[in-house]
Amino acid sequence: MKLIAAKRVRQLPAGFTLIELLVVIAIIAILAALLLPALSRAKVKAQRIACLNNENQMGIGSQVYADEDDSHALTGVCNFGDDDLNWLYPQYVPNLKVFICPATHHSISNNPQPVSGYVQTRRNDTGKTYEQRLHDNSTYIPDLEEIAEDGTAYNAGTKTGPGTSYEVSGFINGNNSTAASATWTPNVRKTQNVAANYIYQNILNYAVLGKTLTFNLRGQKASPSSMWLIYDGDDAVQYPPGGKWSNNDYPDYIDNHGTDGGNIVFCDGHAEWVLQARYPATFAFGTEEEVYQVYPYP
């Protein structure tokens, strides 16, 4: 007689109930809400560090440039308003990406032009030709001549446009017009000797957010570690279009790193992060520019 084994019925696991599913979704939403700000902050910090690395490379390049320069000048700009960075490329900083802050969408086209065709439109306070200031480099990159914020095609909302992300502070006590036709007394070019021995000339009164900040620098000896050389580009921009102008040389939300602050290269070659609250004071000692105003923005 055959024995017929009873078939075992395998029970399938019960599915999630609607309530359990909603609880899981709620937990995922809470975790995302907690993690996303942290990830955003980590991204911002990483961009800031990468930008600082860019400036460190430019700081090292400026020291080598000065060592090889006949006047031991720390930059190759023609006056205090000039932000041209061609004097660094390619001899001292060979990578064009170094001139773009990773917190922006600025761009630089690698299209070398002959220096022989360069037309000087700014006042030249150096006594040197453009080719001499480029240390006999025969070409230049047009997009390295100015910061992206100054370009006519710049979009402040997306931080997009051709040009560099960094300004140059090649002269101390900069308070004169930089037009080619100007005949006023030139400012003092930052050389290795000037950075080590300069005596401040002015008492500065800065209007900052409704307060007057006074910096009595006159007679004090400057230091290479406090004098600015290169910094996060920060010119005044009208944004939104037709709206208020942002502040010049003061971190606003549309600037490279927003209102947090900015990276700065000093005349001794080191670079550091400077918080927004410290910006006016470091700007005073770093540039000795007489005119400085900060208004609420936006």
Regions found by a protein language model. Give the residues of each.
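Generic hydrophobic-segment detector
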Residues: A5, F16-L22, A32, I60, ...
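Amphipathic alpha-helical segments typified by the pilin-like N-terminal helix
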Residues: I4, R10-N53
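Short, well-structured segments within or immediately adjacent to enzyme catalytic domains
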Residues: I49-P298
